[in-house]
Amino acid sequence: MIDGQTTEPKQKTRIILAPMQGLVDDVMRDLLTRIGGYDECVSEFVRITHTVHSRATWLKYVPEIANGNKTFSGTPCTVQLLGSDADNMAANALEAVRFGADKIDLNFGCPAPTVNRHKGGAILLKEPELIFHIVKTLRERLPAHIPLTAKMRLGYEDKSPALECACAIAEGGACGLTVHARTKAEGYEPPAHWEWIRKIRDSVDIPVTANGDVFSLQDYIGIKTISGCNSVMLGRGAVIRPDLARQIKQYENGGPVKDTDFAEVSKWIRQFFELCLTKEANNKYPIARLKQWLGMMKKTFDPAQTLFDRVRTVKDADEVRRILNAFEHEINV
């Protein structure tokens, strides 16, 4: 990619920020959608077990509900549920809607062993009939105007159930499906099998969103071309390269495509830390989240490694703020 390059206008693609548990919480959603390029984001999953969650619980995980289901930059946010009890998932979905949620997504893709042991996420890909029952139950009980979508992987151990599970989701009544192009067993090991997204897209009559291994504009062009999808979900790539969605929109709009520099990134880092402090005015949460993010970005931005080294052993938020301010000044001199 060349800074300043201009392209012809492309067919519009929806760019969605992925739900990533423990990584893209409401603060990260807020920041990344402020940077721009996103048409929608999806919340971290809200785990559904044997209880019906209170309003306080919904707002803890998806505070966007109280803001008209939008991040503070105005990007729509969808509520994601994870579970296997169709009746209780439906009851919770109805409560979320009662409190203001206007779109529900179902998680059939989480690869976390703890989640899978409790019959949630990707383990359900072993049971297409149960997936169908869950989707059908929620679709029948939710108000007709509330969109119901789902996210899945290609399977648990292998890809053999991929088409059956996708069809179960579509036939159950979902109006959209996101496919992460790996099995649970593959975790996040490359490569993502983008060609399988096309197979699924060709097998169902609902819109399919492509997801997996999009870390650059070139990756985006590749997944869109191979999958044939007009909707792409960004996951880890969105965190590692915070301006990725913005670059994609520049490309799609036919304008100049320009990489960010670390002077701009340093401003986002400081802003992120301040947003974390606003959420929890203590030392633990803001510092842990900052170190997590820097630890991911240092693979792409060399100065992130330098900044990570400076804050790695710091445990006081005021000291971290001082380091961030000094580093930003240093970068911008």
Swiss-Prot record:
UniProt keyword terms in alphabetical order: Flavoprotein, FMN, NADP, Oxidoreductase, RNA-binding, tRNA processing, tRNA-binding
Function: Catalyzes the synthesis of 5,6-dihydrouridine (D), a modified base found in the D-loop of most tRNAs, via the reduction of the C5-C6 double bond in target uridines. Specifically modifies U16 in tRNAs.
EC number: 1.3.1.-
InterPro entries per the UniProt record, alphabetical: Aldolase_TIM, DUS-like_FMN-bd, DUS_fam, DusC, DusC_C, tRNA_hU_synthase_CS
Substrates-to-products reaction catalysed: 5,6-dihydrouridine(16) in tRNA + NADP(+) = uridine(16) in tRNA + NADPH + H(+); 5,6-dihydrouridine(16) in tRNA + NAD(+) = uridine(16) in tRNA + NADH + H(+)
Active-site positions on this chain: 110 (proton donor)
Cofactor names: FMN
Gene that encodes it: dusC
Site (Interacts with tRNA): 47, 107, 188, 289, 291, 312
Disulfide topology: none
Pfam families: Dus (PF01207)
Entry keyword annotation includes Nucleus: no
Taxonomic superkingdom: Bacteria
Protein name: tRNA-dihydrouridine(16) synthase
Molecular-function GO term, any one: FMN binding
